[in-house]
Every structure is written in C-alpha cells, then in structure tokens.
C-alpha cells in the first residue's frame, strides 16, 4: 500500500467505502478489467446506462470484468436517496450484480481521492472535472486508467475496448 506521501501509481493504492460503510481495498481487483462509473437514479441516462452495464457485466464477468459503481448527487441532485434506497433500486429494477459503493463527490474540494486520481490520469479533452452522471473510466488488469468515456457513451459501445483488455477475441 502506498504511504500518504507517495503519489498513487494505480487504482490499487486506494481504499473506498462500500454501501455499508466498510473499507474496501481496491487491490482486491488486481487482475480484473474495471469500469468505474459515477451513477445516479434519477437521470435521463439512468435506464440506458444501468441496462447496458448489467448486460455487459453478465457477458464478461466470467472473463474478468468488474464494474464499480459510485453514486453521486453532484449533478442536478439526481441521486438524493440513501445508499439503501439506491442499492434497492439498482438491484431490483436493473438486476445489477456488481458492487454499488458509498455515495461520493467526484468534483470539488470534497472529491473522493479515487476520483481525483482518475481525473488526473485521464483528463485531456474532458478537462479535470467530471461533466455529468455516468462518466466511465476503463482500467486495465494492472490498475492503470486506460480510457475515459463521456456520459452519453453507452457501455455497449465500449465493448471492443473491454474485449481487448480482457484478451477476448
């Protein structure tokens, strides 16, 4: 684990909170390809993104894909519910089997350290801020951020990149 003074080298240097408030060391995902996404329950993009995320997860979870979903209420107040309400909605309505973590800020002074790292790894065209719900980061098996996708990019359209990282033909 990286000490506080050293700069994080990969997402494995971070610990986040799960939906129950327990610490989760992201190094448990070593060897997995990850989609890290900020989610919201009341966004116009909710249905299409959650449906696609669930489908792509079912298709590739056995090959090593994991999706890490982080609820965020910073965009139009579209994630106002408690973490229990969010989990219930996602698991019941969208049959999500991937982890939903504790609610986070993705921008500003209180942004989660993981999100500060993600943004610094893949800023570029997007700048340093997350623009809206369902911004997606693709992470390789070594914990490196390899790509960033806009909220309107569907998880299904990421499939070619996901397959490449998984080594699936």
UniProtKB/Swiss-Prot annotation:
Top-level EC class as recorded in UniProt: oxidoreductase
Keywords: Cytoplasm, Oxidoreductase, Peroxidase
Top-level taxon: Eukaryota
Cytoplasm listed as a keyword: yes
Listed InterPro entries: Glutathione_peroxidase (IPR000889), GPX_AS (IPR029759), GPX_CS (IPR029760), Thioredoxin-like_sf (IPR036249), Thioredoxin_domain (IPR013766)
Keyword Cytoplasm assigned: yes
GO molecular function: phospholipid-hydroperoxide glutathione peroxidase activity
Assigned EC number: 1.11.1.12
Reaction(s) the record says it catalyses: a hydroperoxy polyunsaturated fatty acid + 2 glutathione = a hydroxy polyunsaturated fatty acid + glutathione disulfide + H2O
Gene Ontology CC terms, in alphabetical order: cytosol
The protein's name: Probable phospholipid hydroperoxide glutathione peroxidase
Species of the source: Nicotiana sylvestris (Wood tobacco)
């Amino acid at each position: 684990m990286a000490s506080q003074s050293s700069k994080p080298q990969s997402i494995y240097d971070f610990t986040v909170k799960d939906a129950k408030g327990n610490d989760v060391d992201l190094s448990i995902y070593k060897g997995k390809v990850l989609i890290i996404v900020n989610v919201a329950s009341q966004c116009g993009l909710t249905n299409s993104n959650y449906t696609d995320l669930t489908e792509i997860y079912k298709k590739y979870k056995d090959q090593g894909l994991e999706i890490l979903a982080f609820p965020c209420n910073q965009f139009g107040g579209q994630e106002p519910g408690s973490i229990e309400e969010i989990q219930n909605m996602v698991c019941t309505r969208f049959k999500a089997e991937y982890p939903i973590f504790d609610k986070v800020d993705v921008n500003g002074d209180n942004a989660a350290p993981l999100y500060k790292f993600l943004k610094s790894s893949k800023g570029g065209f997007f700048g340093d801020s997350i623009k809206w719900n369902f911004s997606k980061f693709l992470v390789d098996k070594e914990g490196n951020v390899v790509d960033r996708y806009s909220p309107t990019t569907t998880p299904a359209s990421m499939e070619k990149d996901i397959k490449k990282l998984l080594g699936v033909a």
